[in-house]
Amino acid sequence: MGKEKTHINIVVIGHVDSGKSTTTGHLIYKCGGIDKRTIEKFEKEAAEMGKGSFKYAWVLDKLKAERERGITIDISLWKFETSKYYVTIIDAPGHRDFIKNMITGTSQADCAVLIVAAGVGEFEAGISKNGQTREHALLAYTLGVKQLIVGVNKMDSTEPPYSQKRYEEIVKEVSTYIKKIGYNPDTVAFVPISGWNGDNMLEPSSNMPWFKGWKVTRKDGNASGTTLLEALDCILPPTRPTDKPLRLPLQDVYKIGGIGTVPVGRVETGVLKPGMVVTFAPVNVTTEVKSVEMHHEALSEALPGDNVGFNVKNVSVKDVRRGNVAGDSKNDPPMEAAGFTAQVIILNHPGQISAGYAPVLDCHTAHIACKFAELKEKIDRRSGKKLEDGPKFLKSGDAAIVDMIPGKPMCVESFSDYPPLGRFAVRDMRQTVAVGVIKAVDKKAGGAGKVTKSAQKAQKAK
């Protein structure tokens, strides 16, 4: 078998009709985890519905529909392979909670693939003031997705088809605005593709002899190639934060007969091992970890990215819950946040937001109302420079530094210390009103809290 390939996560962004689904579907279909039988079944259904041309998007529509109906679909369907990586598509917009998911980061994307449509009028619509292209790219950058690939799609529908002039015009325009957001266009691969016909997806296209390939210049190594697949292969692999102290936000807590209390969640930073003494914040409960499991197999250690269940002694299901965070009691244990300072960007709010506004925040797995206690300064969202002190209110499009106070105990961290616990979505009126990153946290020193017998024993034994 040799060494397993590295896993990377990508998010596919772009305007609603840019062809994201077709492009993604094409990759999954050609290099991915969908088996022949499923594809044949889809093709048959597509033909019966008169979608006989079998758009690749159909694959994705089927998967999406299942995901939306809450059927947890086999996640391998959202995977494909390049020569170097196993790639998982964590989400593709168009999914209802896309923005929320992108922020609360069910998992953090290592790279964003921005799809723009080259068709007449289509590109302009996507990039216009209210097109989603800008918002998605800005979000990706704000949330720390620092690598970007741009697929200029639907090259088969330019005027004339496969027009070099049109491609160059789009590259120039996209470069200008991703630069404004904060990306350096020299580090971004631009690829002219047709997700539908397959041009430059996996093999170089004979329809665009003028395209001499893409090149990226970056301090971690330059790269070049022709196809979208090669561009994905040149993503810089992520460094997983094993050296940081443990942070594990709980997704659920189960009570399992004969075993006891089993919290479940994803290790975001650090390492979780049996025998460790962990503290749960904000509830301030400390106990010993008896065992750690993943996919029903016992682990000697769980690393960042692992979704695990772990058995804890002398803790009832009432003591800990979803949204709590587990950490090492001896190494920067997590604590309750009395308040925190954040940089927020208001995405869509019909009115004005002033001090006292108390929407729900989604941060890691926590879902808690927080009050905008003080609007400290309004800033330029591109440069971060201060525009005014103590603004009276904020409206859509504004960026600001604000002080926030949780309505109930919660545990968050600064983005610079623990990125997954330092970004949040602000939800109100059933939509994402704002996104933010936490700059600083005022931690509540809570004394010892509840320390279970097994924790005391384990601590003595050391």
Swiss-Prot record:
It is found in: Cytoplasm. The modification N,N,N-trimethylglycine is found at G2. GO terms for molecular function: calmodulin binding; GTP binding; GTPase activity; kinase activator activity; molecular adaptor activity; protein kinase binding; translation elongation factor activity; tRNA binding. Residues 14-21 are annotated as: G1. GO terms for biological process: cellular response to epidermal growth factor stimulus; positive regulation by host of viral genome replication; translation; translational elongation. Residues 70-74 are annotated as: G2. Translation elongation factor that catalyzes the GTP-dependent binding of aminoacyl-tRNA (aa-tRNA) to the A-site of ribosomes during the elongation phase of protein synthesis. Base pairing between the mRNA codon and the aa-tRNA anticodon promotes GTP hydrolysis, releasing the aa-tRNA from EEF1A1 and allowing its accommodation into the ribosome. The growing protein chain is subsequently transferred from the P-site peptidyl tRNA to the A-site aa-tRNA, extending it by one amino acid through ribosome-catalyzed peptide bond formation. This is Elongation factor 1-alpha 1. It comes from Gallus gallus.
